[in-house]
Amino acid sequence: IEQFDEMDTFIFLGTSYWDSDFQDLLKDSLTSNPRPFFVSNPDIVAPHKDFFSIEPGYFTLKLINEGINLPLWFGKPFSTIFEMALEKVQFITGSSINMSRIGMVGDTLHTDILGANSIGIKSILMTKYGLLRNQNIASCIKKTGIIPDYLIEGP
């Protein structure tokens, strides 16, 4: 816990090596000394070919449910990541961007499509890839109320 306690802030990027021991250390450290906690990936799970991985959103929700202060989110669907990307494109091109000409392609309604819709760019849902593959897409859209501008099968 000493290494955790030495940190001024935390950035939660991924869970490849994360386990319950690290989770307990982080919780104890943030409980005894609250400080900024950034989360770049609010996904709870991520689909892989043969399994689902548990992602930072899952562990962050556990912390919230255990009384840890709300984190600072900056991954999809939160606007910060989209604003950073748009600023980068404007910087590289040297011109302003017509938002109606930008599209976010993604495979998840709750992050990719919701984020694109909330920032005002076109949303393009891949239906045969990722979390929604083998799902009834129309039913998923109806259930969530998150409506993409376009549907494509995949890459």
Predicted segments with their positions:
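Asp-based, Mg2+/Mn2+-dependent phosphohydrolase catalytic module
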Residues: 1-155
